[in-house]
């Protein structure tokens, strides 16, 4: 599987996911991704490689020992890691292709925000809604 940041300056390849895809609702992921949750999966280090733009990566230690790596051009967070672990944590939305599997769980839902809803009570649009 191939992936990249928003501007395309950084590209990577991941041979296979090594865990199910999950939606992480922890407060750190909410802040880091400006979102209600982050969609992630583990990839073994030997199954991941940067193919271009690695010199444009910077990291931020978001909690003790956990590094989040992002593009210095567009700001896209691509992976997180704890260097002592055998895997990295891939940000699934940065894939340029369908991974062929869907998320299997939501984690850290105790951190859900009161303004989020996934129960189908609000309208959904395939694109931007027309003005009414």
Role assignments for model-derived ranges:
Residues 1-132:
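A short Gly-Trp-Pro
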